[in-house]
Amino acid sequence: MASLPIFDSVSRFLPLTNEDEQFWWRLTGQHMARMMHEAGYPEDRQVECLLFHRFKVVPCLGPRPHSDIPWYKSRVGGGAADGCPINYSWRFGTADRKPHIRNFIEPLGTLTNTPADRLNEVATKALLQDYAMTLPNVDLELFWTFAPHYRPRIIEKADMEKLAGASLLVGAEMSPDSRTIDIKAYMYPRVPSQTSQLLTTILPQAMRDAYGEDVCLDSLNLVRDFMTSDPQGSQLTLTGTTGIDCCKLQDTRVKIYVITRNTSFDHISAIMTLGGRRPISKELLSQLQTLWYELKGAPAELPSSEQLPAQTKPDGSKNPIVVPFYFDIQPRLALPDVKAYIDVSTSPVSDLAAAKAVVRHLEHHGSGQNPQAYLNVLQDITPVEELETQKGALAFYSVAVKKNELDITSYFNPQVYKRYFAHEVQLNGQRRSAFE
């Protein structure tokens, strides 16, 4: 793989810090550098984003690994992840847009995983406040208004211990032709009753508090009605996860995440079109169906009304397939956008085969700029033989419809803990990490 001269030049003049930060910088800094290099980011933008990553992300990743077992299992990356507090996304380019790179982190601090911070909120809120003070485009008005509505009101100690875990994540998008870093926050209600009240009580009140009593809730109400009255929409289940943009109030979006266990493509297309309310051409739906079947290892001739074949775990039990979506709510728009997530972490298709299927799709339809660059990134982060034979590098592909084409994003993991001993073996059997 080609060298990374910009990463090397930036690293040369960085001050020495503790071994934890040195570890995370050498590992994740190189990952970020590789992604920007392959995506064709301008050199000055690469330097800017690398410095942001070093000083505004790396210090929040906590202690470096000392075994293959995480001291705190982060929920970043979902079921495919190994507990590492960071993962990445690569939004494929279009004919007129370069790929966009993001990372997602669960900030870890001195109070993480202690009784003082059961929901791991302290480090995240401190990081968001720091971003608001140093990034001129970051505005936390919506976040600070929404956060109290999502925080559980738990009194009993046993309940708090049972529901402890991540309640906040942070995403940072580094567009190639921008001078800003766009920040997103993700909130996770920990109490099941909160999730059931999300569309009827929590979100309407939070949006009125944020935007004013006269805020237009047409888009939110459409989602609620679709999930209540539509035969297809009523099969959706709220996860409780809500994403918001940390920017000026008039530009913010609220993303509501749901899942379905119906895997027929007729059902998937009905959700993408909101039961016909969002027109999507037959050509694009056909493209999505082909990609859906290929990534899920389903035969191409499977009728669109049929469920995907059940997937079997190594122990012989069945692995249920869950399909996530999100609805993109904006008060100024009456109709929400919809995005589907294709989980490849449990698919019978290997990570490398899945990645190549997406690249073939993009090349066949003339989408994206140099999609092969994405394969270079994956093969730099994870050896080819592991991409061919093991799972865990890839988490999801998301698919939306933008400007009459499929807008595809890949979410993938650095596998810091899972590959810990593999690196030791590579160093001639020495009992230390290859990252040391």
Curated annotation (Swiss-Prot):
This protein's UniProt keywords: Transferase
Keyword check for Calcium: no
Biochemical pathway: Secondary metabolite biosynthesis
UniProt-recorded Gene Ontology molecular function terms: prenyltransferase activity
EC number: 2.5.1.-
Gene Ontology BP, a term: alkaloid metabolic process
Matches recorded under NCBIfam families: arom_pren_DMATS
Physiological role: Prenyltransferase; part of the gene cluster that mediates the biosynthesis of neosartoricin B, a prenylated anthracenone that probably exhibits T-cell antiproliferative activity, suggestive of a physiological role as an immunosuppressive agent. The non-reducing polyketide synthase nscA probably synthesizes and cyclizes the decaketide backbone. The hydrolase nscB then mediates the product release through hydrolysis followed by spontaneous decarboxylation. The prenyltransferase nscD catalyzes the addition of the dimethylallyl group to the aromatic C5.
Family listed: Belongs to the tryptophan dimethylallyltransferase family.
Name recorded for this polypeptide: Prenyltransferase nscD
Organism whose genome encodes this protein: Arthroderma gypseum (strain ATCC MYA-4604 / CBS 118893)
